[in-house]
């Protein structure tokens, strides 16, 4: 059995003179969840539409389970999509919404009723079949949309920013539910989001896209710290990028020096480099060396941490500080870097 289940080969998509997907290759293994992550306009939604058959590639091929589906319609690809907007029918009951696709396939009433019951149980909505859309919450509506896709037992499940309309607590619980169901059912899945936390929470692999190409692939969160791309720094967590120097495992930014024990992981030669610092990698103290002194410009309490902007070494630095580790009345402090959350880049 071939484990390369969903394959995009040399895919290019142009609209007029504008190329939005440029010679893209992508392989999704059987039974895995892969997320396309990137800012608006990076091409991730176009890839989704190409896989689903909603758009045709300008060139290249798409294979599902070894079959060339490049020219196949969406009806012939055995794919289901969970949309951001849920797209539920308000005049139908929950059971009829979930069973709509089965009815279109001509599945008998008895089998349809049983499969709808099983699908609703999967998403913890047993007993909801007779309710209507306006009688359930947003999180429950999203689970109905998920059940409607799962009931068809598709070869490929596509999820298009499915959690963006939910509040923070619902997003957390729903991404856990989506991941649990995907692993339990073994459905090959393609997930699209611009939220990096969401991406890593649900995925076997994360694909970062920018300007129609794959910039990087990662299976672990270390990706965010160790191999983040300079061109995506603002999107990927507001890291601060500083001019620095590397010398045998010691990093210098101006007069501030600190050891970086995993410096060899970054494939950056000794000498001038770029040093990326994540907001959570910075600790503020009341004392320190002159080279670490910073001026507090602003501090906003975000509910579970302080988001601080400090001027240090001539640059505004974004810092996330725990409530018990920061004095909101402070006007100055001293910066300390922790190794986890520091990454190095070659100067272009």
UniProtKB/Swiss-Prot annotation:
Location(s), subcellular: Cell inner membrane
UniProt-annotated binding residues for ATP: 38-45
Start and end residues of each ABC transporter domain: 6-236
SMART domains in the record: AAA
Coiled-coil region(s): none
Catalytic activity: Fe(3+)(out) + ATP + H2O = Fe(3+)(in) + ADP + phosphate + H(+)
GO annotations of cellular component type: ATP-binding cassette (ABC) transporter complex
Record has Ribonucleoprotein as a keyword: no
Top-rank taxon: Bacteria
CDD domains: ABC_Carb_Solutes_like
Primary enzyme class: translocase
Membrane topology according to the record: Peripheral membrane protein
Keyword Nucleotide-binding: yes
Enzyme nomenclature, EC number: 7.2.2.7
InterPro entries with a match to the protein in the record: AAA+_ATPase, ABC_SmlMolc_Importer, ABC_transporter-like_ATP-bd, ABC_transporter-like_CS, ABC_transpr_FbpC, Mo/tungstate-bd_C_term_dom, P-loop_NTPase, Transp-assoc_OB_typ2
Keywords attached to this entry: ATP-binding, Cell inner membrane, Cell membrane, Ion transport, Iron, Iron transport, Membrane, Nucleotide-binding, Translocase, Transport
UniProt GO molecular function: ABC-type ferric iron transporter activity; ATP binding; ATP hydrolysis activity
Family as reported in the entry's similarity comment: Belongs to the ABC transporter superfamily. Fe(3+) ion importer (TC 3.A.1.10) family.
NCBIfam families assigned: PRK11432.1 (NF008513)
Reported function: Part of the ABC transporter complex FbpABC involved in Fe(3+) ions import. Responsible for energy coupling to the transport system.
Quaternary structure annotation from Swiss-Prot or TrEMBL: The complex is composed of two ATP-binding proteins (FbpC), two transmembrane proteins (FbpB) and a solute-binding protein (FbpA).
Protein name: Fe(3+) ions import ATP-binding protein FbpC
Organism for this UniProt entry: Actinobacillus pleuropneumoniae (Haemophilus pleuropneumoniae)
């Amino acid at each position: 059995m071939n484990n390369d289940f969903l394959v995009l080969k040399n895919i290019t998509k142009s609209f007029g003179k504008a190329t939005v997907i440029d010679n893209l290759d992508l392989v999704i293994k059987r039974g895995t969840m892969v997320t396309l992550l990137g800012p608006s306009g990076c091409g991730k939604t176009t890839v989704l539409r190409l896989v689903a058959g909603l758009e045709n590639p300008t060139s290249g091929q798409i294979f599902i389970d070894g079959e060339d589906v490049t020219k196949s319609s969406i009806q012939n690809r055995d794919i289901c999509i969970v949309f951001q907007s849920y797209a539920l029918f308000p005049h139908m009951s929950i059971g009829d919404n979930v069973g709509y696709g089965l009815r279109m396939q001509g599945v008998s009433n008895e089998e349809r009723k049983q499969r709808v019951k099983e699908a609703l149980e999967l998403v913890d909505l047993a007993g909801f079949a007779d309710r209507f859309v306006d009688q359930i919450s947003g999180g429950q509506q999203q689970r109905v949309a998920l059940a409607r896709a799962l009931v068809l037992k598709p070869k490929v499940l596509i999820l298009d920013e499915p959690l963006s309309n939910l509040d923070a607590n619902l997003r957390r619980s729903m991404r856990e539910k989506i991941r649990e169901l995907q692993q339990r059912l073994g459905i090959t899945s393609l997930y699209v989001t611009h939220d990096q936390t969401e991406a890593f929470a649900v995925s076997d692999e994360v694909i970062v896209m920018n300007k129609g190409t794959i910039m990087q692939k990662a299976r672990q969160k270390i990706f965010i710290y160790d191999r983040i791309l300079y061109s995506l720094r603002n999107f990927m967590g507001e890291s601060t990028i500083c001019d620095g120097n590397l010398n045998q495992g010691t990093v210098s930014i101006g007069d501030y020096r600190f050891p970086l024990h995993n410096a060899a992981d970054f494939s950056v030669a000794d000498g001038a480099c770029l040093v990326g610092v994540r907001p959570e990698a910075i600790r503020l103290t009341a004392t320190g060396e002159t080279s670490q002194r910073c001026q507090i410009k602003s501090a906003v309490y975000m509910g579970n941490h302080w988001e601080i902007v400090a001027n240090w070494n001539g640059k505004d630095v974004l810092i996330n500080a725990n409530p018990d580790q920061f004095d909101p009345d402070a006007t100055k402090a001293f910066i300390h870097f922790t190794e986890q959350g520091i990454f190095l880049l070659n100067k272009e």
